Amino acid sequence: MTQAVEYKGLGRRKSSVARVIIRPGKGEFHINKRPAREYLTSDLYLKDANQPFVLTETFQKFDTFVNVKGGGLNGQAGAIRLGIARALLHASPDYRTKLKAEGMLTRDARIKERKKPGLRAARRARQFSKR
C-alpha cells in the first residue's frame, strides 16, 4: 500500500490555529471540509490565504486541506496563509527566498492585550472628572 505524498504546516494568527495539508494535485482548496470560497466569504480573505501559492506560482499544483479553529475570519485567513507557506517549504526549500522576502514565514505576534484590574478594558480607564 503506497501512501500519497503530503506536506504539513501549522499556522497561527491572533487566536486562530490552522493545520494545513498540501498534496500534489490539481488545485482543490478545502477549509474544514468545505470549499474555500464557501468558507471564506470575502474575496479579500481568500486572496490573503492564497498568497503563498500566488508568490510561488503553485496554485494549480497542490490540493490543499485545512482544519482551522478559533478567532474570526481575518485571523483564520492569516493562520491559513502561514500554514500554507510552511507546508510549501516542506515541499520545496527553494521557495524560502520568495516567501521570506514577502514576510510569509513570519508569525504575526500581535494578539489582544489583556484587561487590567481597575480599568474598563486593556488601557481604557473610567472617565476622570477634576470637579
Swiss-Prot record:
Keywords of this entry: Ribonucleoprotein, Ribosomal protein
Gene3D superfamilies listed in its UniProt record: 3.30.230.10
GO CC, one annotated term: cytosolic small ribosomal subunit
InterPro entries: Ribosomal_Su5_D2-typ_SF (IPR020568), Ribosomal_uS9 (IPR000754), Ribosomal_uS9_bac/plastid (IPR023035), Ribosomal_uS9_CS (IPR020574), Ribsml_uS5_D2-typ_fold_subgr (IPR014721)
One Gene Ontology MF term: structural constituent of ribosome
Classification via Pfam families: Ribosomal_S9 (PF00380)
Any one GO BP annotation for this protein: translation
Family of this protein: Belongs to the universal ribosomal protein uS9 family.
Official protein name in the record: Small ribosomal subunit protein uS9
Species assigned in the record: Mycoplasmopsis synoviae (strain 53) (Mycoplasma synoviae)
Lineage: Bacteria, Bacillati, Mycoplasmatota, Mycoplasmoidales, Metamycoplasmataceae
